Swiss-Prot record:
Presence of the UniProt keyword Ribosomal protein in the record: yes
Transmembrane segments: none
Similarity field: Belongs to the universal ribosomal protein uL3 family.
Taxonomic superkingdom: Bacteria
Cellular component GO terms, alphabetical: cytosolic large ribosomal subunit
Positions where N5-methylglutamine occurs in the chain: Q153
KW Ribosomal protein (keyword) present: yes
Organism of derivation: Alkalilimnicola ehrlichii (strain ATCC BAA-1101 / DSM 17681 / MLHE-1)
Record's function text: One of the primary rRNA binding proteins, it binds directly near the 3'-end of the 23S rRNA, where it nucleates assembly of the 50S subunit.
NCBIfam families the record matches: L3_bact (TIGR03625)
Protein name in the entry: Large ribosomal subunit protein uL3
InterPro entries found in the cross-reference section: Ribosomal_uL3, Ribosomal_uL3_bac/org-type, Ribosomal_uL3_CS, Transl_B-barrel_sf
Annotated GO biological process: translation
Length: 218
């Protein structure tokens, strides 16, 4: 039963297939997630499961959260996350139960959510891949300027969504349809083909793929 799991990005490496091909993989360290609460349609209006992962010193846990963890009978974690589940899956879960990497298997396709690396305030060339203007031929100040951002008196404004300079990165991002290459249950590791959002050590959420791409689709 694959619901999802919260882990930490440990870095990237590569593994070799039986025929010697090199496959780049991201290593996700996912210690057992502890169920802290089960959402039910009768009480909450939907079915879901709330989990915590990792650990946190008692003096760093607020009293409300300490009581929440104590009521579930689990050790305090570094945060809480929630997964939507079907009514049937919710029945099989209860507070205190653990979710491990063994809920996934090699060859399975997953979606991974994380917070992308923050790049600070970036211009349009770096942020949106705009082409630069001429280096010479009368251009002396606008080499990396975006150019026109609108029209004239009509409409007399800049349209929403216009690609301009601004904060780059540090946003919640999801990469879809990544293949699980290997599951190491002994060391609580998931090896996923390709790269995932975020810096090394950041939290990532691994879920079964919602819209799995079939072979041959472009």
């Amino acid at each position: 039963m694959s619901i999802g799991i919260v882990g930490r990005k440990a870095g990237m490496t590569r593994v070799f297939t039986e025929d010697g091909a090199s496959v780049p993989v991201t290593v996700i360290e996912a210690s057992p997630n502890r169920v802290t609460q089960v959402r039910t349609p009768e009480r909450d209006g939907y079915s879901g499961v709330q989990v915590t992962a990792g650990s946190r010193r008692p003096n760093r846990v607020s009293k409300p959260m300490a009581g929440h963890f104590a009521a579930a009978g689990v050790d305090a974690g570094r945060g809480v996350w929630e997964f939507r589940v079907s009514d049937g899956q919710a029945i099989e879960l209860e507070a205190g139960k653990e979710l491990t990497v063994e809920t996934f298997e090699a060859g399975q396709v997953v979606d991974i959510t994380g917070t992308s690396k923050g790049k600070g305030f970036a211009g349009t060339v770096k942020r949106h891949n705009f082409r630069t203007q001429d280096a010479t031929h009368g251009n002396s100040l606008a080499h990396r300027a975006p150019g026109s951002i609108g029209q004239n008196q009509t409409p007399g404004r800049v349209f929403k969504g216009k690609k301009m300079a601004g904060q780059m990165g540090n946003k919640r991002s999801t990469v879809k349809n990544l293949e699980v290459v290997r599951v190491d249950a002994e060391r609580h590791l998931l090896l996923v083909r390709g790269s995932v959002p975020g810096a090394v050590g950041s939290d990532v959420i691994v879920r079964p793929a919602r819209n799995q791409r079939k072979k041959g689709d472009s």
